[in-house]
Amino acid sequence: MTAQKLDGTATAAAIKGELTTRVAALHERGIRPGLGTILVGDDPGSRWYVNGKHKDCAEVGIESIRIDLPATATQDEIEDAVRVLNDDPACTGYIVQLPLPKGRDENRVLGLIDPAKDADGLHPTNLGWLVLGKAAPLPCTPNGIVELLRRHGVEIAGAEVTVVGRGVTVGRPLGLLLTRRSENATVTLCHTGTRDLAAHVRGADIVVAAAGVPGIVTGAMVKPGAAVLDVGVSRVDGKLAGDVAPEVWDVARWVSPNPGGVGPMTRAMLLSNIVAMAEQTDS
């Protein structure tokens, strides 16, 4: 068996086409959605991610608002930038690019974001609404995973899902999304401290690997015909490596490549959050 590809690049392109139409309709009503970013320092990876987000905005007609601060920016200066975007009517929503330089209080900065402008869907208030099942901006990567599965016809309702990784950006909120009544999956959350990871993975119809441990999910662990999504990012000998070993492609029915799988979907869901926020202001 050679797995079919869960093609995040093509799926994200289709979503951006849909968003372009929705943004054009907003423009006709005099509403111009705007995405803001706060970047502190000059880390090449962070700058690449931010540049990509603004490129995506240009493709669908969303305005860009950038605040770039030096690595020497103080905690107060970063918090002031957050307040600027909170108060800017041209900014529909925004993100603070992480990580911040050492010595800065990331949780305090993120807590200052206006929850209504939380484009990443990771503000404590919005995560709380997710727990309660109320409408709020959704975390981009988990939402992208669900959308990628849905658009490829992978059955989620009733599926046994094993999530490997307990991070706040993927593992923990993904379980909340997948157990909503609209998805109705049964989720097992594993991590690097799980005693018998193979047993949990082997029983899963869907596996999401997001531990940041290269090759933690092997072909021997995976049930034939499962869907496997590789979300982990780490480096081995200076090269990017995912959490899913190559031989998984010979066992699974569906595999998301890394790169080209969940990453493009994360960016597409960020745009989707901005457009949804703008549409709510028009309602």
Swiss-Prot record:
The keyword Acyltransferase does not apply. The keyword Isomerase does not apply. It comes from the Bacteria. Its EC number is 1.5.1.5, 3.5.4.9. Keywords: Amino-acid biosynthesis, Histidine biosynthesis, Hydrolase, Methionine biosynthesis, Multifunctional enzyme, NADP, One-carbon metabolism, Oxidoreductase, Purine biosynthesis. NADP(+) binds at residues 165-167, 192, 233. It holds the Pfam family THF_DHG_CYH_C. This is Bifunctional protein FolD 2. The lineage of its organism: Bacteria, Bacillati, Actinomycetota, Actinomycetes, Propionibacteriales. The gene is folD2.
